A protein has these predicted regions:
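A short, well-ordered alpha-helix in the C-terminal region of glycosyltransferases
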Residues: 135, 220, 227-241
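Aromatic "clamp/platform" in nucleotide-sugar-dependent glycosyltransferases that forms part
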Residues: 148, 167
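Short hydrophobic beta-strand element within catalytic cores of glycosyltransferases
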Residues: 184-187
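Conserved acidic donor-binding segment of nucleotide-sugar-dependent glycosyltransferases
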Residues: 199-212, 220-225
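Carbohydrate-associated surface elements
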Residues: 44, 65
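Nucleotide-activated donor-binding/catalytic signature segment of Leloir-type glycosyltransferases, i.e.
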Residues: 131-147
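A conserved mid-protein helix/loop that constitutes part of the nucleotide-sugar donor-binding site
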Residues: 85, 89-108, 114, 118, ...
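Membrane-proximal helix-turn-helix segments that form the acceptor-binding/catalytic region
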Residues: 21-38
Length: 255
């Protein structure tokens, strides 16, 4: 017969965006319990979900499909020039991604005498708000909204550091992609990146979800470029966890 599957891509405990579609948590839980399997993109996403719903349904973790070979090929399609130490961020310009936080962090850097570039790749409903914020904080020379790019990998590869400052992530595709490209990474402590980068910052540096923590984490790399090389090496090792064939077999096994 037909199997019913539900795929959970986000930390619903901290970012319960589905709430408005149900009368109550009890009704939402009931829907999940009608499924044959509930699939999660990370162990942490699953644990947070169970904190919220504690369903009795069969649950499984299958990482998002990450094709490192293709990502590396695409990253080499063309080159972009950078002028100075460059931090790259990629994502939709929406509240969950907290790009306003990185703009405030950029201001702290400028106030402390640093001259670094921040590239924000992506489009979304907050574009004009963020653009105004950059202008109001006199950061037009340091923070650049690059808009939607069909090939963001080129920008990630070219930058010195990749940063994710999200409020909530289930897996964080873009952090995984940055690992494939062997980038030094700083991320806020959301469930996906904690799992990908290691809870003790083994493969990338984790920061608390506030401007000062993010500033201090990025500053580690700006002040000591050797740290960039160290974490590039760690990222390349970590990217070996992504295996297309293994992930596809896991998906086929539940269909």
């Amino acid at each position: 017969g037909i199997r019913h599957l539900s795929w959970v891509h986000v930390d619903l405990f901290n970012f319960h965006w589905t709430k408005r579609y149900f009368k109550s948590n009890k009704h939402e839980k009931k829907c999940y319990e009608l499924m044959d399997d509930v699939i999660f993109v990370s162990n942490d996403a699953k644990n947070k979900f169970q904190q919220l719903f504690n369903v009795t349904t069969s649950t499984k973790v299958i990482y998002n499909l990450i094709d490192c070979k293709t990502i590396v090929l695409r990253a080499n399609e063309f080159k972009v020039e950078k002028r100075k130490f460059t931090v790259c961020l990629v994502g939709r310009l929406v509240r969950q991604k907290q790009f306003d936080s990185i703009i405030r962090v950029a201001r702290i850097f400028v106030d402390n005498g640093y001259d670094i570039d921040f590239w924000i790749v992506g489009a979304g409903c907050l574009e004009s708000d963020l653009s105004k914020m950059i202008h109001d904080l006199h950061l037009d020379d340091n923070v650049h909204l690059l808009g939607y790019k069909p090939n963001p990998y080129v920008y990630i590869k070219c930058a010195d550091l990749f940063v994710s400052c999200s409020l909530a992530e289930g897996f964080s595709l873009v952090v995984a992609e940055a690992l494939c490209l062997g980038k030094a990474i700083v991320s806020t402590k959301t469930v996906g990146p904690v799992e990908l980068l290691g809870s003790n910052s083994e493969y990338g540096v984790l920061a608390d979800n506030d401007d000062e923590s993010l500033y201090n984490a990025i500053k580690l790399f700006v002040n000591d470029y050797n740290k960039v090389f160290v974490y590039q090496d760690k990222a390349a090792k970590r990217s070996l966890m992504f295996d297309v064939e293994k992930t596809m077999n896991e998906i086929y096994s539940i269909l």
